[in-house]
Amino acid sequence: MESVTLGVRKGAWTEEEDKLLKKCIEKYGEGKWHQVPLRSGLNRCRKSCRMRWLNYLRPNINRGNFTADEVDLIIRLHKLLGNRWSLIAGRLPGRTSNDVKNYWNTHLQKKLITYPRAQPIPKTQKTIVPKGTEAQPRAHPKSPPRPSPPSNNEILWWDNKTVSPQIDNIGIHWSIDGSIFEEPILGNLQSAGDSFLQQNQSDWSDIFLEDVNLWDLLGDD
């Protein structure tokens, strides 16, 4: 086996080798490629015999130009199967895997197909804080300001207002300088007070006179 392996012929096939391979396939059929070199008398490996038959010697091979339907089918099958040329060629009657691969590399890969590129993952931008500065806390929404308590001046002013209100109903008004100016109602009050004092004075005078007369009488006795 080692001597046979070392003596395997490589390179281009001759016409005589092609005839021997055709006769072997016509007699035994396709398959069992490991027996083809012995049955045909060829000094070739089984892979070389299989590729030579499928790509060049098979009688139903189509050597014409690829049609638009075939090109469209190749593109769709390549999206599904990738570079599995034997499977793609099996869907195209009369086309070999070698012809499909060559047509793809020559016409379609560079002109029609653009492989999608992986989208780069966007990097999260980091905020650079200069040295010596501290991160400021987030600004929270300010609550409405609370009313401040009244000052002492305001309290005194309000006390004065409550203690000495303006009495419009009885005719008393505060003047600009703080003094009170009187209206007729104050005059009436004053006259009433004067009459009251005069009456009291007369009463006390009568009592005094009565006391005097009484002492006089007592003195006379």
From Swiss-Prot:
Keyword annotations: Activator, DNA-binding, Nucleus, Repeat, Transcription, Transcription regulation
Location relative to the cell: Nucleus
Main location: nucleus
GO terms (BP aspect): positive regulation of anthocyanin biosynthetic process; positive regulation of DNA-templated transcription
Domain HTH myb-type: 1-57, 58-112
UniProt xrefs under InterPro entries: Homeodomain-like_sf, Myb_dom, Myb_TF_plants, SANT/Myb
Tissues expressed in: Expressed in stems and leaves. Expressed at low levels in ovaries.
Annotation: DNA-binding region: 33-57, 85-108
Region (Disordered): 126-154
GO cellular component: nucleus
Domain of life (superkingdom): Eukaryota
SMART domains, A to Z: SANT (SM00717)
Molecular function GO labels: DNA binding
PANTHER family for this protein: TRANSCRIPTION FACTOR MYB8-RELATED-RELATED (PTHR47999), TRANSCRIPTION FACTOR MYB90 (PTHR47999:SF24)
Function per UniProt: Transcription activator involved in the regulation of anthocyanin biosynthesis in red-fleshed kiwifruit varieties. Activates the transcription of genes involved in anthocyanin biosynthesis, such as dihydroflavonol reductase (DFR), anthocyanidin synthase (ANS) and UDP flavonoid glycosyltransferase (UFGT).
Protein name: Transcription factor MYB1
Source organism per UniProt: Actinidia chinensis var. chinensis (Chinese soft-hair kiwi)
